[in-house]
Every structure is written in C-alpha cells, then in structure tokens.
Amino acid sequence: MRDTIAKLFKPSNIGTAVFFALNFGLVLLIFAPYSFTPYGIATLLLVYTLTVAISLSPVGEWMLSVFAGAKEIKRTDVKLKLVPLLEAVYNNAKEKSPNMVDSIHLKMIPGNETNAYAIGRRTICVTEGVLNLSDEMIMGIFAHEIGHIANRHSQIQLLIGGANIFISTFILILKAIAWMITGTFGLFALGSRKFTTGCLIGLVGSLSTILVYLWVKLCGLFLMWSSRKNEFVADEYAYSIGFGNQLAYVLDNVIETQTKNGFLKALYSSHPERNERIARLQELGVTYSRW
C-alpha cells in the first residue's frame, strides 16, 4: 500500500495525483462548511479510506476482472501454451524487481481481437486473439503488462476505480440537490405562472448538467495524460527485462495503438501513438526494424 501511494507521485502519475486532489476538493466543497471541521474531515477520510481499502483488496481486483469479462482458463492446451511463456517473462522480471508479487494470475477474455490488460496486484487478462501469435510476440505482450504490475500502474487503476465510486456518489448528491432546487422553483412557477421563474428552473437544471459534464471531462484529461505516460514506462520495463524487440514487433504489426485524428481526441487517448512508442524503444536500444 505504501509503495503504491509512493508511486502515485512519480512524474508519470502527476495527472492521476491531480485527479485525486480535484475530486477530494470537490467533496470538501459539496459539504462545506461541515467538511472543514475536524470531525467532518475525519469522517470523509474514513469513508474514502474504506473505499480505497476495498478497491485494493482481492475483492476489488476480482470485481474489476468481472467487469472486464475475464474468466479462468480451463483448457489444458491453452494453459500449456501461455503459462510457460508467462513464467519465463516473470522470472526475468523477478530478478529486476525482487519485491514483485510471488505469482501472476492469468485470465482469458473472450474475443478475437488481440489485447491484454494488467489488473490489480497480480492479474493479467489476455484476449483469445493472443493465442494466434507466436511465442516471442506473446512474451513481448506479457513483459509490457508485467511492467504495469511492477510499477503499480494496475493497482493505481484500482484506486481510481474506488475514487470514481466515491466521487460518483457525491456527484449524484450534488445533482439531486440541484434538481430539488429546480423542482421547488418549478412548483412555485406553477403557482405563480411567472415566466422569469420558469427560465430560472431551466437555467439551474442545465447548469448542473453542464458543470458535471465539464468536471468529468477535466478529470478524464488528467487521467489520460498519466495513462499515456505509464505506457512508456511499461514499454521501458519490457525492454529492461529483455523483451523490447518482441514488444516493438507486436506494436508495429499486431496491436492497434494509433491515436485518432484531432487534438482533443489525442488528448483523451489512453495510449500514445504507436510509432512514438516504437521510436522510444529504439532510443533505448531496441534493434527492431520493419524492413
């Protein structure tokens, strides 16, 4: 837990730290002035700590796996193909990061696309499309995902999930208050039949919706910035344990990481543009070339 919090303040996670600060600040404002009393702050911190504890527990990791549609691998032939490859990569990673978890739990997501996700402290989920790749390519994918686990990126995602539940609850409260005000003015307008009051009703309702939308977009901007930075960190980790060329080949030929056109779409992309990732790997020493 302490190591996860420490890694939250690494340069690549600045956006995530800003996300937490903004959202906790919002909660303080919603419940002001009560939230600025010692008892109020203690209550909010207690609720938030419980949310975080549940998120970082095996329960939180299991829930995220369920949401991702990941299932236990039951077929023997699939295990025989994937598990030895994962163990080979994990052994290299363990030498570099002795404090890493003692084992990695592998799960499968139905679907023909080729992708993989690190979840929580020790889970890697791969789609069925990964089975069509060569062993070298699969190890490149595993190395990248283990990079996320080693750098606690996947645990931080659990923290974000817990924070989203925490914040969403209070945003719902804020919206409920806004609609209560709107309803009160609406009843008054029906009784008085005043045009000005009717306009005020619409204004309050519209502003509450717009402000919530802008807040979510602002927080998403910081999260996506950190997500793109962390992809580079995981790529570098894969290179450092000996799988840089394999990862570069996968990025260039299999996994689509192209950022959509447009400045705003690029800002809200969770992954950097693939050519930039390959170029970074080549700067580190990867010898991969398409030709």
Question: For the regions a protein language model found, what residue spans apply to each?
Answer:
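A short, glycine/Asx- and small/polar-enriched loop/turn
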Residues: 115-122
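Active-site His/Glu-centered metal-binding helix of metallohydrolases
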Residues: 142-150, 233, 237
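Short pre-active-site segment immediately N-terminal to the catalytic Zn-binding motif
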Residues: 125-140
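Pan-zinc metallopeptidase signature
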Residues: 226-230, 243-248, 268-291
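Acidic/histidine metal-binding catalytic segments
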Residues: 103-105, 159-160, 244-254
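Residue-level signature of catalytic and energy-coupling elements of molecular machines
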Residues: 61, 126, 144, 234, ...
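Hydrophobic or amphipathic, alpha-helical segments that drive membrane association/targeting
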Residues: 1-114, 164-229, 256-260, 284-291
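Catalytic Zn2+-binding segment of zinc metalloproteases
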Residues: 130, 146-165, 243-244
